[in-house]
Amino acid sequence: MKKSFLLFLFGVAFSLTSFAQQTIIRGSVLDGTTGEPIPDVTITIEETNQTTTTDAKGEFSFISNVPLGEQVLKVEKIGYVTKRYPIVVNEGSTVDISGMTLDYDPGDKKDLFTISISDDNLNSEDDGLTDNVSGLLQASRDIFLSAAAFDFSSTFFRPRGLDNANGKVLINGIEMNKQFNGRPQWANWGGLNDVQRNQEFTMGISANDYNFGDLAGTNNIVMRASKYRKGGRISYASANRSYQGRVMASYNSGLLKGGWSYSFLGSRRFGAEGFIDGTLYDSNSFFAAVEKQINDKHNLNFTGIYAQNRRGRSTAITNEVFELKGREYNPFWGLQNGDIRNSRVREIEEPILMLNHYWDISPKVRLNSNVAYQFGEISNTRIDNGGTRLVTFNGESSFLGGARNTNADYYQDLPSFFLQDPNPSALDFQQAFAAQQEFINDGQFDWNLLYEGNATVAAQGGNSIYALQADVIDDSQISFNTILDADLADNIRLNASLNYRNLNSQNYARIEDLLGGTGYLDVDFFAEEIGQDVTDLLETVAQSDIRNPNRIAREGDRYKYNYEIDAEVVSGFAQAQFKYNKVDFFVGANVSQTNYQRTGLFENGNFTGTGPQGSFGESEKLDFTNYGIKGGLTYKISGRHLINANGSYFTKAPTIRNSFSNARQNNFTVTGLESEKVQSADVSYIFRSPIIKARLTGFYTGFEDGTDIGFYFTEDLAGLGIDNGDAFVQEILTNIERRNIGIELGFEAQVTPTIKLKAAASFGQYTFTNNPNLYLTSDDFEGELRFGDGTTNIKDLHVAGGPERAYQVGFEYRDPDFWNVGVTSNFFSNAYIDASNLSRSANFTSDFDGNTFNDFDPATARELLQQEQFDDYLLVNVVGGKSWKVDDYFIGFFATINNVFDQQYTTGGFEQSRLGNFRRIREDQSRDNGPLFGSRYFFGNGTTYYLNVYVRF
C-alpha cells in the first residue's frame, strides 16, 4: 500500500516537474488604434512550420515542439500591416509577449478586389464566365494567387483552368454555391466589402476545417458580429468599370458589457452605364449581425444579408460589328423618350438569414451548428417577338403575327448581308453603304418600333406582338450543418461535418411589360406540326399549356413555361491532420447523396402527357451517390525549404442545369447521365525567408464523365430532309473528358524596408482528351438526333476559359509616411475560342439526307475547323494610396488604374453553330466581305479607374 502511494506521489511530482519545465510561447495581439483584442490573427514562428491564430480574446500560445534560441514571430492579418517580433526562447521557460499591436493597413488591396469579384463580374451570361477567381479574396498572402486576384482576373484568367464551379464559398461555415449550376452567386453579398474582410481560405484540395473542399479551394467568409474590429467606416467610391459611384457606411460595436456585439452596414452602388455602353447599375445592400456570448462555452450569432442588384447586360459581338462600333458597343440598349433603356436587365434579390451556434465543449473540442434560409428570385429580361392571334377559317385554325428579329446587330441589318453574293451589284453596294451609315450613326435597340407595332395591332383588335419577358428563377433553400473541430492530441486534429440542403426552385417566364399592348396570346408562334397524329395539330402543338389553351397573358402573369425543381443534398465529411517536427500530413473523405426532380406545372403542346415522358407532373427522380478521398503531406527540409504534395479522387453529381435536357418544356432527363469523376495532384516547392518568398507548383487534374448542355438555333441538320433542317435545339454533351496540367510560380523579394519586387507566372494546358457523345433534342423534330457514331471530334482542342499562360513582374513601394504605390506589367497568351461541337460532328460532312458531301475536302475542312487562338497582349496596372491620422480618425484614399496604355485585346469568344455543315461554313467563311455568321467575341476593357475615399473611426 505504502509502495503504491509512493509511486503515486512520484508520478505526480514527475508530472509537475515536467510541466514546470515545459517551453511555452504565449501572448496577445491588440488593435494599435483602439486597443481592442484582434481575433484570427495568424502568428508564425519564422523558419519553422509552426503557425497558430489568436482566439476571440486576441490570445495565442505555442505549447509543443517550441524551437529554442533566437526566434522571430510574424504577426499578420488581412487589413493590417504585418509585423515581426524578435524573441529569445530558453528551455523550460515561458515567453510572454502579450500586448503586441497591429496597425490598420490603409493600402490593403482587399477592398479593390472585393469590388472586382462582386461587381465587375455579375454580367456573365452563365453566372461563371467571368467571376473566375473563386475564393481568392483571402488568398492575397499567396504571391501567385494575389496576382491572379488583382491583375489577372480582368482577362477571364482561371487559376489552373478552373472556374467558380470548382471552388467552394461559405459564409459562417454554410455553403453558398448554387445547386442549379454549382457556382457561388457573388451578387448575393455584393456591396458588403467592409464586412467581408475576415476570411479563411484554403488553397486547392488541401485540408480545411469545414468541408471536403474542391479543386479551386474553399473560402469561408466569417460574418460574426464578435469578429469585427470595433469602430466605423464611411466611404465613397468613383469608378468607370461597372458602376459609377458607391457610398458605404458600417459600424461594429466590438464586445459590449453583457456579452453582446453587433455590426451593421448599408451601401448603394449606382451608374447609368459602365465601361460598356448602356450597362446600367442599381444596387442596394444591407447587412446586420448580432451576437450574444451566453457564457464561456456558448455563443449565438444571427446574420442577415440583403443585396439587391439590377444591371443592364451586354453581349459578345462579331468582328464586323466591332470594326463598325468598337469594343464599348452594346446592342441591347436604345433610347426611349431620351433615356437609355436596356432590353436585357438582370435583377437579383435573394436575402440570406442565418443562425450560428458556437460551443466550446472543452478547451480541445469545439462544435459549430448552423442553419440558413435563403429565398428570392433572379430574373433576366429579353424581348419576346412571337406575339400572335388565333384565326379560324373554314374550321381550320392558324396563328397570325410574329415579328422580325429586333436585335440591333441582327445580321440582316449589317453591310455584309447585302454583299454576300460573290459578285455584288451596284444596288447591293448602295444598300450595304446605307446599312453601314445607319449602323454607325445609330445601331441601337429601337424601342419606338415595338410600341408602334403593338399600337398598330391593338387598333385592329389584335394582341401584342412584342412583350418584355423575364425568365425567373424563384428559389427557396434551407441549409443545416454541424461542424466538429477536436484536438485529439497536441499534434493530431480531427475535423468532421454533417450537411443538409433542401431546395425548391420555381422557374417560369413572366410578362414584365406589354410595351403598350393589351395582352399576349400564350402560344408558340414558331411551333410546327411534326407528326401525323391528331394530337400534333398546330393548335395543340403551339400551346404553352394545353390545360389552359389560348390564354391571354397580362403583365405579371406566368406564361410560356412554368415548372418546379426540388433538390436535396445530404453529405458527411471527416478529416484528420497530423503535425510532426519534419512532416505534416492529412487524410480526408466525404460521402454525399443528391437527388433532383422536376414537376411540370404547364403541359406543353409539343410534349403532352404526364410523368417522365411528358411535360406535366413529376419527372423521373434522379439520385446520385458520391464520395471522395484526399490526402496531403508537407515535408520540412528546413525552416526555409518545404515540399508540399496533395492528391485527391472524388465524384461530383451533375448540376441541375446539366441534368434535364430541356427543363422549360418537358420532363426529359439527360441520356447517359453520370456523376463526374475527378482526380488531381499537385506538388510544390516553397521557400521562405525574411527577404524572399517563393512557391513553385506543378499540377494535374483529370475530369471524366462530364456533361454540358447548350441552346441555339441552327440550319441544315443532316438527315431531316431538305425542308426540315432548321431548328432551335438543345445540344447535350456527355462523357466529356478533360485534362488540366501546368506550372505556377510566385516570387517576391523585400529588397528594402520600403520596396518589394514581385513576379508570378502560370504556364498551363487545358484540353479535351476524348470525343464526347453528342445528341440534339428539339420541339421541331421527334426524339434524339445523333450524327454518325454519335460523337463530336474535339479531342486535343483547348477548353475555352481565358489565357492558359500569364506572367507578371512588378514592384510595390510603401513609404513610412503612410503612402504607397505599385506597378505591375502582365503578359497573357494562349487563349482560345470556344469551339462549336456541332461543326465537329458527322453533321459537318452530311447533307440533308444524311449522305456525305461529294465535294468534301479534308484539307479544307481542317482549315475551317482550326481552333482560333487569340493574340497575345500586355496590360500595365497602377495602384496607390495615402492615409492620414487626425485625432482618432483615419482619413485616406485608395486608387487604381487598370490597362494604363489602353491596350485592345480579346478575352474570349465562341463559334456560332447556326451553320453546321461543310458547304455552308465554307461558303460563309470565303465571302470577300466577311461572313454572315462569324464568331462572336468578348473584348477587354480599355483604361479604367477606381478611386475610394474613406474615413475610419
Regions found by a protein language model. Give the residues of each.
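Gram-negative outer-membrane beta-barrel transporters
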Residues: 579, 700-702, 726-837, 950-952
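Outer-membrane beta-barrel signature, preferentially recognizing the C-terminal barrel domain
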Residues: 330-352, 356, 554-557, 561-567, ...
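Acidic/polar loop-and-plug regions of large Gram-negative outer-membrane beta-barrel proteins
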Residues: 291, 299-356, 379-470, 533-555, ...
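Short acidic/polar hinge/loop motifs at secondary-structure boundaries
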Residues: 63, 136, 145, 174-205, ...
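Surface-exposed extracellular loop regions of Gram-negative outer-membrane beta-barrel proteins
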Residues: 310-312, 316-321, 538-554, 595, ...
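N-terminal periplasmic accessory domains that precede
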Residues: 96-104, 126-137, 155-158, 186-189, ...
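C-terminal beta-signal and adjacent terminal beta-strands/loops
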Residues: 704-705, 709, 827-845, 849, ...
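Transmembrane beta-barrel wall of Gram-negative outer-membrane proteins
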Residues: 24, 238-271, 275-314, 345, ...
